Amino acid sequence: MALWGGRFTQAADKRFKDFNDSLRFDYRLAEQDIEGSIGWSKALVSVGVLTVQEQQQLESALNTLLIEVRSNPQAILQDDAEDIHSWVESKLIDKVGNLGKKLHTGRSRNDQVALDIKMWCKQRVIELQSSLHALQCKLVETAENNQHAVMPGYTHLQRAQPITFAHWCMAYVEMLDRDYSRLTDAYQRMNSCPLGSGALAGTAYAIDREQLALDLGFDVATRNSLDSVSDRDHIVELLSTASLSMAHLSRFAEDMIIFNSGESNFVELSDRVTSGSSLMPQKKNPDACELIRGKAGRVMGALTGMLMTLKGLPLAYNKDMQEDKEGIFDALDTWQDCIDMAALVLDGIQVNVERTKEAALKGYSNATELADYLVAKGVPFRDSHHIVGETVVYAIQQHKALEALSVAEFKQFSDVVEEDVYQILSLQSCLDKRCAKGGVSPLRVAEAIAEAKARLS
C-alpha cells in the first residue's frame, strides 16, 4: 500500500508504478532507514507522541528488522513496495500492528531520504578511505622494494630525465593522499543531520534536533529546512572526488599499460590480473589496468549527470532527486573496485631492472646534466641550452651517447668541457644531483618512503 493513497480515487497505472518506484535500487538504504527510524522514535518520546514503552517496542521491532536486512538484503527486492521507506514501515506494522503507524508522525520522506543518503555516504567515505590507505601502503611497499630500479622519466611520452621506479610509485602516493583529504573535507560538510526538516518547512513538533543529530552520529543539525531537503551537495562532492581520483587511477593504469607493453617491457604483470586471447595464444593482456582506465569515464559520467539533474531544480524537493541514488551507488562501487584492483595489480608486479636501466641510458636523458655542467663552468644557461642541443644533434648523427663522445668532440661546441664531464653524465650522478626536497635522488626518495610509512602507520 502506498503511503499517500488517501488523496487518490484511482489506482496508479502499473507502467507508472514501475517507472516511479525506487525500491529496486534504494533498498541499499535499508539499514540507514531503520537506524534513522530508531532515532526518530526516541525524538517522538521527547515531545509526547510516543510513550517510553511504545518507543522500546518500536526499537525492538526495528532492531529485529535490521538483523533480517543484514542477513539477506536481497530479500527486500521480492516486495512491491514503492521505496525503502514504504517497505520499512510496512514490515514494522507487520511486527507491531497499529503502533507502527505512529512512527511517521512529524516526519516526511523528504527529510527521511535526505538523512538516509547522508548516512550511507558517510559510511562509504570511511570504507573508501580504508581502500585508499591500503593502496597507498602497497605503493610505498613497491617503492621501497624498487629504489634502485632506474628508468626514464617522460614528458610528452618522450624520454626526459632519469628517475627511479620508486619515485614513480611515490608520485601516486601523493595523488591518493589528496584524494583521501578530499574525502575528509567532504565528510565534514556532510556531517549535519537533516531529519526534523519535514517536507520543506520543518516539523510541527518541538523536536530537539541537535540531540537528534547527536543520536544519529552527526555533529550538528542542519540550519534551514528548505535547504535540508533540497541539498545533494554531498553527492556531488563525492562524485567529484571519485572522478578526480579515477583520473589518477586511470593515469596509473595507463602508465602500467605502457610499462607492460612489449615495446617497453619495464614491468611484468601477474597472471592474476591479466587475460589471454581467444585467437592468439601468445597474448597476455593487461585487462585489469584497461578496465580501470575505461571505468573512469563511467564515474565521471555520473558526476556530469548529477550536475545536470540538479541545475534546474526549484526549491524544495522534486522527484528528479530520486535520480541521485543509482549514480552515486554505481560510481562509488566502481571507484572502490578500481582502488582495490590497482592494489592487486601492484601485489604481483615484477620490475625488469635491466630493461629500465637500458632505456634510461638511451634518449639523451642526461642532456640537462651537461647543460648544468656548462653553467657551473660560467656559461649562461640559455647559451648552455643551445650548446647542448647542438651537441645532441651531433651525437645522434654519430650514433653515440653523450657519455661516449670524446673531450675533443665536446670541445667542438664548448671549450670549457674537460675530463670531469664524464662524472656528471652517469645515471647515478643524474639522480644524486636532484637532491632538493621532492627530488629523485636516492636519499630524498628514501626519506619520502620513510615519511609516507610513518604517515600511513
Curated annotation (Swiss-Prot):
Key words, A-Z: Amino-acid biosynthesis, Arginine biosynthesis, Cytoplasm, Lyase
Keyword check for Cytoplasm: yes
Pathway annotation from the record: Amino-acid biosynthesis; L-arginine biosynthesis; L-arginine from L-ornithine and carbamoyl phosphate: step 3/3
Coiled-coil residue spans: none
A single BP term in Gene Ontology: L-arginine biosynthetic process
Location in or out of the cell: Cytoplasm
Gene3D superfamilies the record matches: Fumarase/aspartase (C-terminal domain), Fumarase/aspartase (Central domain), Fumarase/aspartase (N-terminal domain)
SUPFAM superfamilies: L-aspartase-like (SSF48557)
One term of GO molecular function: argininosuccinate lyase activity
Enzyme class, broadest EC rank: lyase
Disulfide bonds: none
Enzyme Commission number(s) of this protein: 4.3.2.1
UniProt cross-references to Pfam families, sorted A to Z: ASL_C2 (PF14698), Lyase_1 (PF00206)
Entry's family note: Belongs to the lyase 1 family. Argininosuccinate lyase subfamily.
Name of the protein in its database record: Argininosuccinate lyase
